[in-house]
Regions:
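Flexible glycine-/small-residue-rich
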Residues: 24, 73-77, 205-208
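Extended helical coiled-coil dimerization/tether regions that scaffold
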Residues: 179-187, 194-261
């Protein structure tokens, strides 16, 4: 996925909502203490960088006590399919988790500026009765809704199939922009899948020396190696089988000759 926009709200010096559009190359230019480092730290907090830890003191001092701190990222190039369980696949579009522009907009929200932050999708999501919030419902709850609406499905064990059947039956879903938590049930599973597609965030600090032993350098290389190995996993398994067959053939032949002797 590609990062298209950063959204900061009530984080340090950024009171209210601030949007920063990101191109292939983006430079932040400004005088000292204008908030350039805050932008990079906000990205670090969202992506969970070890050098960027959120603290309650990071909440904007001009915000209200009940105001939330939000750090959002908007992505294009979302995955075509997501695997929910061994038998079910879905898409972000089918789950109504994309915003009005058809992009994936994720926010790490710190309620009242406290806590570890929870991931929410800001999306055009159903608000109609029986269709609202069903991404976060358990299988038994989905089956109860399906029974109430007299819906028959081929596999009642699949939350994906149940949700899509409910959406189709309701018809008018009353889509409205809203925050949907990705902290539990299939929402959590979808977030776990999304994380494998997130861009890698590396932070190089100019005030300290950088070496090829640092995680900013090694982590992308390790990820590239893992991806390459995954792509040729089938070939490697075939090689492993052939090596095993050859070794067993030699061993069997040797034992046969020893028995003859």
């Amino acid at each position: 996925m590609k990062l298209e926009k950063l959204i900061i709200e009530n984080f340090r010096g950024y009171q209210g909502r601030t949007e920063i559009v990101l191109d292939d190359l983006t430079a932040l230019i400004g005088r000292n203490d204008v908030g350039k480092t805050t932008v990079l730290d906000a990205l670090g907090v969202f992506f969970g960088h070890k050098l960027c830890k959120y603290d309650v003191s990071d909440k904007c001092v001009y915000s209200e006590d009940n105001d939330d701190v939000k750090i959002g990222c908007v992505f294009s190039g979302v995955p075509e399919n997501l695997v929910i369980d061994a038998t079910s696949e879905t898409t972000l579009n089918d789950e109504y988790l994309l915003n009005e522009d058809g992009l994936l907009e994720l926010h790490k929200i710190f309620k009242k500026g406290k806590g570890a932050g929870a991931i929410h999708a800001y999306c055009n999501h159903p608000s109609a009765r029986d269709a609202k919030g069903i991404l976060l419902k358990k299988n038994d709850e989905l089956k109860a809704i399906a029974e109430r609406l007299s819906i028959e499905v081929e596999d009642r064990r699949s939350n994906v199939i149940l949700r899509q059947a409910i959406y189709r039956e309701k018809g008018e879903l009353r889509l409205t922009p809203q925050y949907i938590s990705l902290a539990k049930e299939d929402g959590k599973t979808i977030w776990e899948q999304i994380q494998t597609y997130l861009p890698h965030f590396a932070l190089f600090r100019a005030d300290r020396p950088s070496t090829d032993e640092e995680s900013e350098v090694q982590d992308p290389m390790k990820a590239a190696v893992v991806n390459a190995l995954n792509e040729i996993e089938t070939d490697l398994n075939e090689i492993k089988v052939k090596v095993k067959e050859k070794a067993l053939a030699v061993a069997t032949n040797t034992i046969t000759h020893l028995n003859d002797i």
